[in-house]
Amino acid sequence: LFASYLSEHPIDVLKIVPSHFKALVATADGQALWPRKFLLFGGEALSWDLVEQVRRQAACIVINHYGPTETTVGALTTVVGDNEDVRLARTVPIGRPIDNLEAYILDERQEPVPVGAAGELYLGGAGVARGYWEQPDRTAERFLPNPHASQPGARLYRTGDLARRLPDGSIEFLGRV
């Protein structure tokens, strides 16, 4: 149904979860699904195989996007390119923080880990929520003071995601902690 709609109404931008997009491509006339300008993936790890499939069949720009609800959904993003350092990642990197957000890869003591080392992904900045509605214990567990910020009262959101910073500064999602 969606694919038939797209064949009659071409679109410029599509934002979708990779597994959903794969299922659509497998069951539909492929050309109808391709947006004319941008294809944004988010919600789960994006494989290089899917990126290559898109590049073979479409001329649109591929963007990978990461962001939990606790950071107003959008937090990190990248235009998927062929940077040699990035291609060393197992999955397509989730990118760099958008304006007014910071991303930290920290160890169990909340200290930064070296480039390439795995650690937990923490997000800070203007997009971080205040906490969970009427759940003070859960809020205290996930929303922490930011020891790396220059402004007093800054907080971090502990995502529970395992990640590493690549040599080019982008971040690769590795799974859940």
Task: Show the residue positions of the predicted features.
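AMP-dependent adenylate-forming
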Residues: 61-64, 79-177
